[in-house]
């Protein structure tokens, strides 16, 4: 594959609601990335480019980006249903699901319902301690993390206001605790934990409870990296995802633990703009928003 290969925007118009997604490569998908609250699939563009030896997909969750709006249903279960539909339609073989924050919950819910579709599960700094998201935690994170602010939708049309209403009303509540979701998936799981001192949302208690619930858990802590791991340290995330794929290929994953040492923040100015969640302030579509019908 060309070193300059880039993910391409696609639109699955036959689905209800319509699902926008990015794709890279033309083979059988190996990895599917799921973004968090307020973001779009483009947040994973640097990661997808760094793993371009693998065919990858990354959907916009319902109500986000260019995916369709859903009247009154922005629950984790509904989003997981969309993800399952995408896997069934576009992934003929089991994939690795990589979900960040809210996307981690969506990925866990999908894996618990249809484990046969999923080869491995990567949960990136999702707060696992509560089924019901705490808006105060997210407000604090957004206030303290400038990089995160640049990763959420900038234009109103890119995020259905009802998504935030559902979040604050508790409609994002997961169907059961995280450890119960993990118990239903017997494949390998990786927890990638950001630094709590830098705004990371996955706690040490989250990790401990998950380790007790799942016998094949791989845990890595990112020292000095905040919640938006894929933005603040895309290189480190690429390395960890590639390593997890190697673990899967070698058939070994049993309570492995590691730490990604703190490194200088990446020069993300132009990268974040490219990977960001919203369209330009004028509302005009950028090149990345030009849709190709599959």
Say what each PLM segment does.
Residues 151-187, 193-198:
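Hydrophobic, aromatic-rich cap/lid helix
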Residues 225-234:
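Catalytic histidine-centered segment of alpha/beta-hydrolase-like enzymes
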Residues 193-225:
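Conserved loop-alpha-helix segment in the C-terminal half of the alpha/beta-hydrolase fold
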Residues 105-112, 119-148:
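Flexible "cap/lid" loop of the alpha/beta hydrolase fold
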Residues 35, 95, 99-101:
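Conserved alpha/beta-hydrolase "nucleophile elbow" surrounding the catalytic nucleophile
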Residues 78-95:
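Conserved acidic catalytic loop of the alpha/beta-hydrolase fold
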